[in-house]
Amino acid sequence: VTLDLQCGSALESITAAAAKIESGLADLVIAGGFESSSTQPVRMWNSNHPDYQEGKSYTVAKFIPDIQGEQVMLEGAEKTALTENVTKADMDPWVLLSHKRAAQAAKEGILSDIQFSIADSKKDEGIRPSMSQRLLDRLPCLLPGGSIITAANACLMHDGAAFVVLCSEAYRKKHGLTPQAAFRFGTAIGSDPFLS
């Protein structure tokens, strides 16, 4: 089954899997999600559609009103930072600390037992061990007229996937499995993307 709840798709698939197990319709379900920015389709409206413009394409699926453009997540991040009085200077130390911790975790192989390689690579290309304040100071803001969101403190465009195996207590006992976690409750709540 494929669920599309945009950013919440993986959580929703796990919640649906748990509900299926709880209802007795399944004993074991693999659930999760993936995103592949490198294979993201480029779309165009058909020439008979009112939104058609010669040579204009879009990549963000039109699940959202037209007032929200291709950069709605960046715009939302910028607006939220401004609303909450968070400056780029406030964010920079967290950016540096995050990359430092991620690089250390990668070096120590903390996640190596739950990562697998694709094309002989396990490297997380989002980690920048050489990130410095000097580099952060040089990065331009991503939005015209923006003052906060840069390539260093924004979400990455990436390819990635994560899945979990959920099972009933009866299945777990029958097969002698040791759980790593227990699912208690899940919910999805939508909000204004401009306040991401």
Which residue stretches match the model-derived regions?
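Acyl-CoA/ACP chain-elongation machinery
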Residues: 33-41, 119, 189-195
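N-terminal extracellular/periplasmic Venus flytrap/periplasmic-binding protein-like
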Residues: 90-174
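Structural motif
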Residues: 27-29, 147, 163-164, 180-182
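A short small-residue
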Residues: 74-83, 184-188
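Active-site-proximal alpha-helical scaffold in enzymes
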Residues: 5-35, 81-111, 164-170
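Glycine- and Gly-Pro-enriched alpha-helical subdomains that act as flexible
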Residues: 169-196
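Flexible glycine-/small-residue-enriched beta->alpha junction loops
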Residues: 28-79
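Conserved catalytic cysteine-centered active-site region
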Residues: 1-27, 67-72, 130-156
